Amino acid sequence: MHRRRFLGSSLPVFAAFQSDSVFQAKAAVEQVAGRPADSIAMDEDFWLTIRHAFSVDRNIINLNNGGVSPSPKVVTEAEHRYNEISAMGPAHFMWNVLGPEIETVRRRLAETFGCDPEEIAITRNASEALEIVQMGMRLKAGDEVVTTNQDYPRMITCWQQRERRDGIVLKQVTFQVPPPSMDYLTERVMSAVTPRTRVIHICHITNRSGQIFPVRQIVRAARARGIDVVVDGAHAFAQFPFKRDDLECDFYGTSLHKWVLAPIGTGFLYVRKNRIKDIWPLMAAPPSMDGDIRKFEEIGTNPASLRNSITEALTFHDSIGGERKAARFRYLRKRWSNRLRNLPGVQILNSEDPEQSCGIGFLSVKGFDPGKLAAHLWDKYRIMVVPIVTPGEYEGVRVTPNVYTTLEEIDTFAEVVEKLIRRGSIPA
């Protein structure tokens, strides 16, 4: 974000802090201006100021921000404010006053993603965004779709429904975690391509192990063969910085209630402008909207308060800075993983290459059932992680902190797990 906008727009971001926190936050950001992101990642005074923006329950250690993240107070207050405005007379205020502001949200999302606003549809989550494309593509019996066995289950289910309904063929490739290289991932995906392949569906970063995929490399290889690529960016957008042109894809769907910290139930779909007409909307739209990105938003009455609060979340994100966030996420992941990685039976299934990983960490302990480990951490210590099993390949727990996570919380998690490993078992 431009410095001028930050200094001007950061005040709304921090308006929900304690009375003097606005000035503290502004001073903190001014003090780190010009410093490298890796240095700021370890600056606990800076991140303390950021933590003041949240009203999270510190009686739990939430390391499942990959599922859904809490919004800063400025976002929840904006949502409440828009609800109150709407309640004064929804037929007027929701439709005539708040409704048109969706165009500001569209413009801000497009600016952050690096595309034309006329290529952004605001959705309720990544699943809806992606299913618009999956169900709206013109495919016939025998057409092949290539994805991986580690893509998001809901998206795989969507393609399986098209198998049952339309007779398409879904092919799922496996891959090593962590992979030896990005080229390896491209080779694995492209190895399943045949003359009948019409679509490749990949995660920008997987929800399971946090493996980042070489999207542009796969898109270029696919486009040379006339194959469309659908990119699931549910965990990528705002976890680490990138733009549309870094990907070169035609279709991209993401959630905004994870790393953007927007209200729960927000997301967006990007469709390259010349491809909008090729995709049927999930809900009916008139022929006059065939080439209009807004046809994908024709879902009936829905609350303006959620989508309009996205702009506050984007301002908060921009105020911190994408590079700073990514550096902090990597720092937190390495802090716990470096402490545990050399213990008996431990595998950290994340590449140390920053091009391949960011904030999502994956811990596997030989002999430890992931479900029992996650349950013990929650029941005994109120630490929240996600158990994940990829049958026949790997299993463990996913660990996802966020900008409000403290070093004490990370160290508590690592200390508890270390004691369990040295004990050799999970208490019954």
Residues of each region from the PLM?
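Pyridoxal 5′-phosphate
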Residues: 5-428
